[in-house]
C-alpha cells in the first residue's frame, strides 16, 4: 500500500528524471526507462521500485530488465494486413486495439473503447493493433490490421543480436542510450510508428484519435507524426480511471494535442498534479461505459493486467471459500483482462 506522501514523492521523482533525461538527449518518448506504469513490469516500473526498496529489489530489477530485453526476440516483426485501398484519401484516422470478438460479420469493427462502429464514422481509416493475432476473412477496406508475425521458434535470438548491433551503430556505442532503447516497449514503439507514418503519408488525414495509455508507442508515434505533419490534430482518449500512482500520465513530450477525460476529479489531478495544461484537457461523458449499454457484472471475478503474488492470492481465495457458508456463493465466472487473454500465465492462474 503506497501512502499519499509516497505517491507525491514518486510523481516528483519521475518528473525530475524525465527532465534530466531530456537534457541528456535521451529520446524520452522512445525510452522504456521513461515509461512508468505502476501496473506493469517495465524497466521504468523496476526503476521506481529500486528507488523505493534499494538493494532489496536488485535481483527483481535485473529480472525485469532481462525479461523486457528477451521479449524483443519474441516480437521481432509486425506487419500490416488489408492495406488495399491506397487510392482513397481519408481525413480521419483511428488508431486502436482489436480482439476477435470486436469484428462483425459485415466486415466492420466495433471499437470497445469508443463504443463506435467503423461504418459509422464518415471518411475514416482504422489502424488496429491485434492483441490476439486474429484476422477476419471478411474485412472492410477502410480497416488495416497490424499483426505480429509468427515464426517456427518463439524466440528469434538472431534478431535480438541484430537489434543490439543496430543500436550500437545508431547510437555510436553510447551505453546510456542503448540501454534506454534495448527493451520491448521501445522496439514495439518503433515498429508501430514506422507502419503508422507510412499509412499517413498515403492519405490526407486532418485528425487522428486514439485510446491514450501513455505507452511509448503512443508517445513516440505522436512525436514522430508531429515532426512530419504539424497540421494534423491528434486527440487522445483516456478510457479508464487513472491508476493509484499515475506516474505514466505526467504531461510530457509526445502528449496529444487534446486529451478527452471523464470525471472532474481526473481532470483536476491531470491539471494540478500531472502538469497537463488546462487547454489540453476536455471533459466529456464516457464513450466506453454508457448508461444504455449496461453490462451485467454480477457473479464475476475480474483479473488485473498483471497478477503479482499468485500463491498468496490463491491461498487467500481458498481460505475465503472454506469460511463461506454452504451454498452461500453463486457459481463465479473468472474473466482475464482483455489484453492478456492469450497470456499463458494468466490462463494458468485462472485454471488454478
Language-model regions, residue ranges each:
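Catalytic-core helical/loop segments in enzymes performing group transfer/polymerization on anionic/lipid-linked
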Residues: 1-352
Amino acid at each position: 500500500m503506497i501512502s499519499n506522501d509516497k505517491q507525491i514523492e514518486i510523481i516528483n521523482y519521475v518528473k525530475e528524471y524525465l527532465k534530466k533525461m531530456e537534457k541528456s538527449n535521451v529520446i524520452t518518448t522512445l525510452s522504456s526507462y521513461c515509461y512508468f506504469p505502476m501496473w506493469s513490469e517495465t524497466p521504468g516500473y523496476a526503476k521506481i521500485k529500486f528507488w523505493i526498496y534499494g538493494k532489496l529489489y536488485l535481483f527483481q530489477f535485473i529480472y525485469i530488465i532481462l525479461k523486457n530485453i528477451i521479449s524483443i526476440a519474441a516480437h521481432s516483426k509486425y506487419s500490416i494486413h488489408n492495406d488495399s485501398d491506397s487510392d482513397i484519401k481519408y481525413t480521419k484516422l483511428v488508431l486502436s486495439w482489436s480482439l476477435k470478438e470486436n469484428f462483425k460479420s459485415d466486415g466492420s469493427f466495433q471499437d470497445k473503447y469508443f463504443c463506435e462502429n467503423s461504418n459509422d464514422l464518415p471518411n475514416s481509416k482504422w489502424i488496429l493493433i491485434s492483441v490476439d493475432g486474429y484476422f477476419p476473412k471478411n474485412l472492410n477496406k477502410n480497416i488495416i490490421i497490424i499483426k505480429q508475425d509468427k515464426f517456427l521458434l518463439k524466440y528469434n535470438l538472431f534478431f535480438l543480436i541484430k537489434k543490439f548491433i543496430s543500436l550500437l551503430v545508431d547510437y555510436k556505442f553510447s551505453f546510456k542510450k542503448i540501454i534506454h532503447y534495448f527493451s520491448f516497449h521501445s522496439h514495439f514503439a518503433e515498429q508501430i510508428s514506422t507502419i503508422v507514418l507510412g499509412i499517413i503519408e498515403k492519405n490526407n488525414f486532418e485528425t487522428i484519435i486514439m485510446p491514450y495509455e501513455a505507452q511509448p508507442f503512443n508517445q513516440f508515434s505522436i512525436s514522430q507524426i508531429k515532426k512530419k505533419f504539424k497540421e494534423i490534430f491528434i486527440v487522445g482518449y483516456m478510457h479508464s480511471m487513472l491508476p493509484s500512482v499515475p506516474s505514466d500520465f505526467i504531461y510530457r513530450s509526445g502528449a496529444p494535442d487534446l486529451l478527452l477525460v471523464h470525471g472532474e476529479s481526473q481532470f483536476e489531478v491531470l491539471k494540478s498534479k500531472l502538469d497537463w495544461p488546462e487547454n489540453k484537457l476536455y471533459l466529456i461523458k464516457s464513450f466506453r461505459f454508457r448508461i444504455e449499454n449496461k453490462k451485467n457484472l454480477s457473479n464475476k471475478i475480474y483479473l488485473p493486467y498483471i497478477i503479482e503474488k499468485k500463491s498468496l492470492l490463491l491461498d487467500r481465495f481458498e481460505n475465503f471459500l472454506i469460511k463461506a457458508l454452504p451454498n452461500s456463493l453463486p457459481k463465479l465466472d473468472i474473466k482475464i483482462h482483455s489484453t492478456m487473454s492469450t497470456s499463458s500465465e494468466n490462463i494458468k492462474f485462472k485454471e488454478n
